[in-house]
Structures are given as structure tokens and as C-alpha cells.
Design a protein with these regions (language model features):
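Glycoside hydrolase catalytic-domain context in secreted enzymes
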Residues: 1-241
């Protein structure tokens, strides 16, 4: 969303609205501060005058971890200075079918390259553990979309990824292994299904695999109304998730 419903506001308006959200959340009964996130996936593109970079498909072609970390660090600074806390990036998708309309979101079809560049991106956004982790100018990062979004049958978006668990992890899970090692704070669930079951309602993958086996200790966040993709669910109600 844009400050006060208008796209042409400058950074001071973003900061003003962020402060208003924060104060409103702190004045509630529980006093839990709000976390405001944005899809700054190749620059803080909702902010007028922000620097924009190529999408991941272009950045992946460089195979340059230092460059990716530097770019993410620049984006983090602009998100931070606008008063926001979180970016829904990086995507660590592994596109395996060029028919998929979101192949541009992935660094590569090579899981090892996705893992290395995803790790570099997270460290650019959040900083490095023991050095500058979430210090001034850094923001929370999100590894997405867990898991198998780039491996659906015939490249259908929000489709069905039919793989064994070993192949799912070996091909589509390596970006999460590497970003969890860098203490990524958020992981976003995917719209797709795995062997016929939607990810947003899949406890085994989101809890048993991601948290208990992979060791993710952060926040699992849904994609845009992703819970309504689960059978029997709606945007306003989904007990299955």
C-alpha cells in the first residue's frame, strides 16, 4: 500500500505513516508493535525515486555473490529509511520449466547457484551474524516461496509439483537450507501444491520439515490470500491453516 492511498509520496510520508502504524499498534491492549513489509524484490519499487535493479533471472546470470549482497544492502537501506521493517525477498525459486510465467523470480535452475545467491541476498538485507545483523540500515528478509513453486507440472502457476520428498528438498529446498544458515527471519509459504496438497495447509512441510528438520526458527508467513487456495477455505476463513 502507498501512504494515504497516493503513489507520489516521498520518503518522509512513508516514515510518517510507519510511525502512525507503530503508535497505533503499541496503543492496543497487547501493545505488540506492527511489522510493515513490502515486496522490494528488485528495489523498493513502491517508493518514488528508489533505485531499481534487474530481477533475479538477470542477477543470477552474473553468478556474483558479492554483487548480489551489495544490491540487497542498497535495497535494505532504502526500505529502512522509509520506515519499513521487512522485505518479502529474496525468492529462492528454482524454475525447472520455462513455461512458468514467474521464471524471472528465480536466480537459476541450478539449486546450488540459487542457494549461494539466496544466502548472499539475505546477508545483504539483514546483515551478517556476529557482524552487522539487523543493525542500522538493515531489514528483515523473507525466503520464498516454500516449496517447489518452480517445479509445477507443465509450468502452471499455483500448480502441482509432483516429486519425491528427496527430490523436492534436493532441487527446491537448497535455497532454504542456505538462507536458514544465515538466520533468515521469515519464510513465505507458496501457492503451489506438493503431490496434490496445497502448501498453505501442509503441516508436514511447514512445521515438520521447515521448522523441525531444517531448523527454521523464524516466522512463516502466507502469500497474498494464499490460505484461500486450500480446499474448503476462503479469504476470510480457513481453519485448515
Amino acid at each position: 500500500s502507498f501512504p494515504y492511498g497516493k503513489k507520489n509520496h516521498d520518503v518522509e510520508d512513508w516514515r510518517k505513516l510507519a510511525d502512525e502504524y507503530f503508535l497505533a499498534s503499541k496503543s492496543s491492549n497487547l501493545g505488540i508493535p506492527v511489522i510493515w513489509g513490502t515486496d522490494a524484490v528488485h528495489g523498493h519499487n513502491n517508493l518514488k525515486g528508489a533505485v531499481l535493479f534487474p530481477h533475479n533471472i538477470g542477477l543470477g546470470a552474473t553468478r556474483n555473490e558479492t554483487l548480489i549482497e551489495d544490491i540487497s544492502s542498497i535495497v535494505a537501506k532504502e526500505v529502512y529509511l522509509s520506515g519499513l521493517d521487512l522485505t518479502f525477498a529474496p525468492a529462492v525459486s528454482v524454475p525447472r520449466n520455462d513455461l512458468w510465467g514467474r521464471t524471472f523470480e528465480g536466480f537459476s535452475e541450478d539449486p546450488k547457484l540459487v542457494a549461494s545467491l539466496g544466502k548472499a541476498s539475505v546477508e545483504g538485507y539483514q546483515g551478517v551474524l556476529g557482524k552487522n545483523f539487523l543493525k542500522k540500515g538493515k531489514v528483515l528478509a523473507t525466503a520464498k516461496h516454500f516449496i517447489g513453486d518452480g517445479g509445477t507440472l507443465n509450468g502452471v502457476d499455483k500448480g502441482n509439483t509432483v516429486l519425491s520428498e528427496d527430490d523436492l528438498i534436493e532441487i527446491h529446498g537448497q535455497g532454504y537450507v542456505s538462507t536458514i544458515e544465515s538466520d533468515v527471519q521469515f519464510v513465505m509459504a507458496s501457492f503451489n501444491s506438493w503431490n496434490g496438497k496445497k502448501l498453505h495447509g501442509y503441516k508436514y512441510l511447514l512445521t515438520d520439515l521447515l521448522k523441525n528438520q531444517m531448523g527454521f526458527e523464524g516466522v512463516v508467513v502466507g502469500d497474498w490470500n494464499g490460505h484461500q487456495e486450500v480446499d474448503g477455505c476462503y479469504s476470510y476463513s480457513c481453519s485448515e491453516t
